[in-house]
Amino acid sequence: MIDLQLLREDPDVVRRSQLSRGEDPALVDALLTADTARRAAISAADSLRAEQKATSKSLGAASAEDRPALLERAKDLAEQVKAAETTQAETAAAFAAAYMAISNVVLDGVPTGGKDDYAVLDIVGDPPPLSNPKDHLELGEALGLIDMQRGAKVSGSRFYFLTGRGALLQLGLLQLALRLAVENDFIPMIPPVLVRPEVMSGTGFLGAHAEEVYRVDDLYLVGTSEVPMAGYHSDEILDLSVGPLRYAGWSSCFRREAGSHGKDTRGIIRVHQFDKVEGFVYCAPTDAEVEHQRLLGWQREMLARIEVPYRVIDVAAGDLGSSAARKFDCEAWVPTQGSYCELTSTSNCTTFQARRLATRYRDASGKPQIVATLNGTLGTTRWLVAILENHQRPDGSVRVPPALVPFVGTELLESPR
């Protein structure tokens, strides 16, 4: 949720943010109206309760002559208080709905526009000089690494098996990511992948993208370990006196991909289940932008270790999720597509998620304040696409990046004999 003080003092900032996202600025006025109505209802109910309390007190000392009128007034006040409390509850519900409808306020400098209006910040490495490259699925099947056919037989479309050294390649990649995280003071974590609705909602994943989320009974399957790690410290006051608190969560992730019909249907680029190591940071809001750059730096270090060409983009406001105030993506070159494909994203969510989840820290004066939260991918299944396609050789084998050789057990992936 956004900062109500900012809304009340400078609503134009929020309106401009809504416009830059391509969202309705009228939602800001609806929230202001709901806020005014809620506060008025609270004040009215409080005044009536105070009068009711005073009247009840007067009854004890009232004379026989005054008592009937006071009793009548007490009865009338009881009805008024009941009605006022109903109004208070209704205005509170309307306010909560209006409040949840507003996305995070976009930071200054974020490109305006939609999906294709990103700004390219850096390009690293050159596409490999491949003639007639094979795609990752053709390579994966020929080398005994990926089995989509049996994945579909067992679970349906967009499911797969990673087999043999394909499994080792992913496990090695994620272990490498976790090792990098630990070297940089992240606390490793294997979180639950089923979460309560209030945690999923608190992270902003039950808004426009609710159709992407699987539900099992009264719990939700996470599409990223960002969700349980954001909920980990809900309703807590953190000690950030020694600096940001960093976690690295390794989990399976689940997505319906409801909005991607017909897109990336071949192979493992866009699937219903995958594995990921996600970095998550709690910090003071004043440290958030610096921490965002650190997360991006660690992502770039991981990409350097797997030796693939990539670019960094500053995602446009209209392509941001509701929780993100700014997001950087690292996109690797995919030879068979002749284009870049997202491998990582890192988002600065400022205080938006933490305000919903009531996560705070104590400032220098000891006063509780809302923390900032950030997240960033450190490794995921999709990275295998870039590794296989960029490191393929003319004979159909694939060179294993040296950083992954100790995990995979070979320098070259070749057809099984």
From Swiss-Prot:
<keyword id="KW-0436">Ligase</keyword>
<keyword id="KW-0030">Aminoacyl-tRNA synthetase</keyword>
<feature type="binding site">
    <location>
        <position position="278"/>
    </location>
    <ligand>
        <name>L-serine</name>
    </ligand>
</feature>
<dbReference type="GO" id="GO:0005737">
    <property type="term" value="C:cytoplasm"/>
</dbReference>
<dbReference type="InterPro" id="IPR042103">
    <property type="entry name" value="SerRS_1_N_sf"/>
</dbReference>
<dbReference type="InterPro" id="IPR010978">
    <property type="entry name" value="tRNA-bd_arm"/>
</dbReference>
<protein>
    <recommendedName>
        <fullName>Serine--tRNA ligase</fullName>
        <ecNumber>6.1.1.11</ecNumber>
    </recommendedName>
</protein>
<dbReference type="InterPro" id="IPR015866">
    <property type="entry name" value="Ser-tRNA-synth_1_N"/>
</dbReference>
<dbReference type="InterPro" id="IPR006195">
    <property type="entry name" value="aa-tRNA-synth_II"/>
</dbReference>
<feature type="binding site">
    <location>
        <position position="377"/>
    </location>
    <ligand>
        <name>L-serine</name>
    </ligand>
</feature>
<comment type="similarity">
    <text>Belongs to the class-II aminoacyl-tRNA synthetase family. Type-1 seryl-tRNA synthetase subfamily.</text>
</comment>
<comment type="subunit">
    <text>Homodimer. The tRNA molecule binds across the dimer.</text>
</comment>
<comment type="pathway">
    <text>Aminoacyl-tRNA biosynthesis; selenocysteinyl-tRNA(Sec) biosynthesis; L-seryl-tRNA(Sec) from L-serine and tRNA(Sec): step 1/1.</text>
</comment>
<keyword id="KW-0648">Protein biosynthesis</keyword>
<dbReference type="GO" id="GO:0016260">
    <property type="term" value="P:selenocysteine biosynthetic process"/>
</dbReference>
<keyword id="KW-0963">Cytoplasm</keyword>
<dbReference type="InterPro" id="IPR002314">
    <property type="entry name" value="aa-tRNA-synt_IIb"/>
</dbReference>
<dbReference type="Pfam" id="PF00587">
    <property type="entry name" value="tRNA-synt_2b"/>
</dbReference>
<dbReference type="GO" id="GO:0005524">
    <property type="term" value="F:ATP binding"/>
</dbReference>
<keyword id="KW-0067">ATP-binding</keyword>
<feature type="binding site">
    <location>
        <begin position="255"/>
        <end position="257"/>
    </location>
    <ligand>
        <name>ATP</name>
    </ligand>
</feature>
<comment type="function">
    <text>Catalyzes the attachment of serine to tRNA(Ser). Is also able to aminoacylate tRNA(Sec) with serine, to form the misacylated tRNA L-seryl-tRNA(Sec), which will be further converted into selenocysteinyl-tRNA(Sec).</text>
</comment>
<feature type="binding site">
    <location>
        <position position="271"/>
    </location>
    <ligand>
        <name>ATP</name>
    </ligand>
</feature>
<dbReference type="GO" id="GO:0004828">
    <property type="term" value="F:serine-tRNA ligase activity"/>
</dbReference>
<dbReference type="GO" id="GO:0006434">
    <property type="term" value="P:seryl-tRNA aminoacylation"/>
</dbReference>
<keyword id="KW-0547">Nucleotide-binding</keyword>
<dbReference type="Pfam" id="PF02403">
    <property type="entry name" value="Seryl_tRNA_N"/>
</dbReference>
<feature type="binding site">
    <location>
        <begin position="342"/>
        <end position="345"/>
    </location>
    <ligand>
        <name>ATP</name>
    </ligand>
</feature>
<dbReference type="InterPro" id="IPR045864">
    <property type="entry name" value="aa-tRNA-synth_II/BPL/LPL"/>
</dbReference>
<feature type="binding site">
    <location>
        <begin position="224"/>
        <end position="226"/>
    </location>
    <ligand>
        <name>L-serine</name>
    </ligand>
</feature>
<dbReference type="InterPro" id="IPR002317">
    <property type="entry name" value="Ser-tRNA-ligase_type_1"/>
</dbReference>
